[in-house]
């Protein structure tokens, strides 16, 4: 599915499953807490996969996805 493809790309872009501490979401964003935020890819890379943008605030990042975020989160968590 599109959601599973996006989830697998996002995991690579944030430095792999081992770099993800926590995952939540709001209405439109996948919110992640990372161990090391220095290894994540650039916002353009997230946009190339289909994200609308990236909010990077230290170890807390938000991938702006849109209303399909619950299905992307589900696939993302399955890959952790």
Residue spans of the language-model regions?
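Structured cytosolic domains appended to multi-pass membrane proteins
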Residues: 2-80
């Amino acid at each position: 599915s599109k959601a599973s493809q996006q989830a697998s790309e996002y995991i690579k872009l944030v430095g792999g499953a081992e770099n993800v501490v926590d995952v939540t979401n709001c209405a439109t964003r996948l919110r992640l807490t990372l161990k090391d935020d220095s290894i994540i890819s650039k916002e353009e890379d997230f946009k190339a996969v289909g994200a609308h943008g990236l909010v990077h605030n230290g170890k807390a990042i938000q991938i702006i996805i849109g209303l399909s975020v619950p299905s992307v989160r589900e696939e993302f968590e399955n890959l952790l």
